Amino acid sequence: MVVYIVLYTCLAGFILLFLVYYYLTHSHCPRKQLEGEETCVFIENGQKKSLTLEKWSTSDNIQITVIVPAYNESKRIGNMLQETVDHLEKYYRSSSSAGQRRWEILIVDDESKDTTVNAVLEFSNKLDLRDHLRVCSLKRNRGKGGAVTWGMLYARGQYAIFADADGASQFSDLELLFKNMPPGPRGGVVVGSRAHMVNTAAVVKRSFIRNFLMHCFHKLLQILGIREIGDTQCGFKLFSREAYQSIFPRMHVEGWIFDIEVLTLARFFGLPIIEVPITWHEVGGSKMTLLKDSISMAIDLLVIRLNYTFGIWERPSAKRIT
């Protein structure tokens, strides 16, 4: 009887390990690009035009690329774009008489069900932004991380930043991030942070359950060894060209927790990561389902840790920068 118990226990353990391994190796495979997703649209002289993008067709004329992931953001994205364009027009136009724009915005529409694309194009037409504001529509939803990753693969700027469509982060704080960008040809990653706001009204007035889950998430990060960054999830991160071209082709996670893999890969590559306090405010209309997405984030966090720890996902070294 004891022998059978031991055998069944070993068999059950083997099956469990196999299922865990299968989940780790198959659950977070980035979705392949679908036909037509590399085509973007923009407005020129009141007419909608299309353009097929090329991955990293870098241009020294573009100093900064702004990636904005968007899902059902027709009501919020206009204000964010106005603030963003106002800042970019002030700081990122050439000093020549023509005043050439040295910036671009790439909206990655993640299969929105509303009129997000039309709202962006109407905004672009009003300000005559032409192909400096382009919209790409994913044929099937990928999640925030997938949308950001997709956009970064087509960035052209010397630097690239992703910013949330709700405008919660003050876009003019981009200059704070630039001031803290590590010097040298490699650059690095500069992370906008809300960690300094933990005891402010913007956070305290949140619901008890939201603050409780936030603290649980931070504790889990500390347990898993991610301690050097106080706010990993703020949607306002700036990358040098070498940083974004090294990190994003190797991404696996496409959900809310993708920031953790971004920072993990940056650390593997030996890229400096600098955290900078920014101005931030709560904006209604969040797309997160609190309990469901919190559980999903915790699972994804463990998946990231286990896959890199056990070598299931390739762990790049600092010497391997491409």
Curated annotation (Swiss-Prot):
Q: Pathway, per UniProt?
A: Protein modification; protein glycosylation
Which InterPro entries does the record cross-reference, listed alphabetically? Answer: DPG_synthase (IPR035518), Glyco_trans_2-like (IPR001173), Nucleotide-diphossugar_trans (IPR029044)
Role = Endoplasmic reticulum membrane-bound UDP-glucose:dolichyl-phosphate glucosyltransferase involved in protein N-linked glycosylation.
Instruction: Pull the Cytoplasmic topological domain ranges from the record.
Output: 22-322
Which terms in the Gene Ontology molecular function aspect does this entry carry?
A: dolichyl-phosphate beta-glucosyltransferase activity
Species source reads: Schizosaccharomyces pombe (strain 972 / ATCC 24843)
Protein name according to UniProt: Dolichyl-phosphate beta-glucosyltransferase
Key words, A-Z? Endoplasmic reticulum, Glycosyltransferase, Membrane, Signal-anchor, Transferase, Transmembrane, Transmembrane helix
